[in-house]
């Protein structure tokens, strides 16, 4: 790749709602735009999902399409296609504490009265648990319906409140993201975790859609190490990037 205009500047992107519509595949136009953006600045992506799910959205070559690819908030880190770091929830918490948390959560979901339930209520990832009251096996239509229902009935915020109080001794962070679930991970394992790999950059611009308190982009958006930008859609992301990096 030819020398970039601003190699010391990093543009770092959330995935869901920022580069793609929620849980949808990236458009060819957006992929082409990101390719053009790499001619101007260094580019990275950071998502809460594991690498398999991020690859489903951004393509199988995601670790080489961007200079940095951080899955599970950076707990699994790639630079130029090479794995540069991993961290494990199991080794950090231990099986006994994990089991206690999972058992309580499944009991809570079992007693939850919501219109529908499907399957995969807890997804165990290397660096976090993803908890979904409706279950991740639901269809896109069911996802959309649950998101509307949750906005009225606060199913996820209420559940997070109960779990936060019950497991205060574990020092966990609860982060509501996407349409149907929330992530659970040790304090400090939010998206700011990936910043440890980015010390060389003088300027880091972060783009995300859930930048409000409690959203899974909040901590990195507010970090002293980043310049935060709230976006509303992939089109808005592209528009802001054009204005910031490509208009000079």
UniProtKB/Swiss-Prot annotation:
It is found in: Cytoplasm. Its cofactor is Mg(2+). It comes from Oryza sativa subsp. indica (Rice). Belongs to the eukaryotic PMM family. Keywords: Cytoplasm, Isomerase, Magnesium, Metal-binding. This is Phosphomannomutase. One of its GO terms (cellular component) is cytosol. Mg(2+) 2 binds at residues 221, 226. Alpha-D-mannose 1-phosphate binds at residues 23, 125, 136, 143, 181, 183. Its EC number is 5.4.2.8. NCBIfam families: HAD-SF-IIB (TIGR01484).
């Amino acid at each position: 790749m030819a020398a970039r205009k601003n190699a010391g500047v990093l543009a770092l992107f959330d995935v869901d709602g920022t580069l793609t519509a929620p849980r949808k595949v990236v458009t060819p136009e957006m992929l082409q735009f990101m390719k053009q953006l790499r001619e101007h600045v260094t580019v990275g992506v950071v998502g809460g999902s594991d690498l398999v799910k991020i690859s489903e959205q951004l393509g199988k070559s995601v670790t080489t399409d961007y200079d940095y690819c951080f899955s599970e908030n950076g707990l699994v880190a790639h630079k130029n296609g090479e794995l540069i770091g991993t961290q494990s929830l199991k080794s950090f918490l231990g099986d006994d504490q994990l089991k206690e948390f999972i058992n309580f959560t499944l009991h809570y979901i079992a007693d939850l009265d919501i219109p529908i339930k499907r399957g995969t209520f807890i997804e165990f990832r290397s660096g976090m648990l993803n908890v979904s009251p409706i279950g991740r096996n639901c269809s896109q239509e069911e996802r959309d319906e649950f998101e509307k229902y949750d906005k009225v009935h606060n199913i996820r915020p209420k559940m997070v409140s109960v779990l936060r109080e019950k497991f205060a001794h574990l020092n966990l962070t609860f982060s509501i993201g996407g349409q149907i679930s929330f992530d659970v991970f040790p304090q400090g394992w939010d998206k700011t975790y990936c910043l440890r790999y980015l010390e060389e950059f003088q300027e880091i611009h972060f783009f995300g859609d859930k930048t409000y308190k409690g959203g899974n982009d909040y901590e990195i958006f507010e970090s002293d190490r980043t310049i935060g930008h709230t976006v509303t859609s992939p089109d808005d992301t592209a528009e802001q990037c054009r204005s910031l990096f490509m208009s000079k």
